[in-house]
Amino acid sequence: MPTLGVNIDHVATIRQARRTVEPDPVAAAVLAELAGADGITVHLREDRRHIQDRDVEVLRKTVRTHLNLEMAATAEMVEIALRIQPDYVTLVPEKREEVTTEGGLDVIGQQTHMADVVQTLQAANIPVSLFIDADAAQIEAAAQVQAKFIELHTGTYAEAKGEAQQTQELDVLKQGCDRAAALGLRVNAGHGLTYWNTYPVACLPGMEELNIGHTIISRSVLVGLERAVREMKDVIAGRG
């Protein structure tokens, strides 16, 4: 059964809507862990639209499970990661105009740069995951740059219309898991997962961790964060 990494970006989104001090994502991380979260994920974007540098610094000191820092592969972010020392880093694509991450990294198109970033971080004992589509060529490129993990982009699966298309996209993810395993890559997944579509992804062979945020934070507005996290844990375990 995969573990659950709770992404708390959207707690910060609510805070930044008013440029105030609440709700505090650090407090949300504590509640998520108490409810059974196996890890905490945050995306420190270049435009700082939600998570702020202060959040990452305090989370590094307070998270008791593990801290996954999502970031672009830029010199600024590498410097921050080396200073903060998260438990691992997930490199993600980033465009200022996007509402949320729109797809996986093009590792093939920037293989030399990715290899340099991966080497720099892993030399500092920070394992690196690459957020990529379940494309065989991209998975092979991830192995070539010596990443420890990949995180499969589940957005296309999540947006599939109808059972047939969803089944087709799930098979693409399964093939990605199989290819990654053959190359010695560990596999996480995330993006667009909800209480209604997560379980099939949790059942994929070799799946280690699911990073889920928006649906949990949305649910927490209605039932509270601890219950929302527990309910997602139940979904992953097949009890939901």
Curated annotation (Swiss-Prot):
GO cellular component: cytosol
Chief location of this protein within or outside the cell: cytoplasm
Protein residues bound to 3-amino-2-oxopropyl phosphate: 7, 18, 192, 213-214
Keyword annotations from UniProtKB, A to Z: Cytoplasm, Pyridoxine biosynthesis, Transferase
Keyword Phosphoprotein: no
Source domain of life: Bacteria
Protein name: Pyridoxine 5'-phosphate synthase
Pathway: Cofactor biosynthesis; pyridoxine 5'-phosphate biosynthesis; pyridoxine 5'-phosphate from D-erythrose 4-phosphate: step 5/5
Catalytic reaction equation(s): 3-amino-2-oxopropyl phosphate + 1-deoxy-D-xylulose 5-phosphate = pyridoxine 5'-phosphate + phosphate + 2 H2O + H(+)
EC top class, as a word: transferase
MF-aspect GO terms: pyridoxine 5'-phosphate synthase activity
Protein role: Catalyzes the complicated ring closure reaction between the two acyclic compounds 1-deoxy-D-xylulose-5-phosphate (DXP) and 3-amino-2-oxopropyl phosphate (1-amino-acetone-3-phosphate or AAP) to form pyridoxine 5'-phosphate (PNP) and inorganic phosphate.
Positions bound to 1-deoxy-D-xylulose 5-phosphate: 9-10, 45, 50, 100
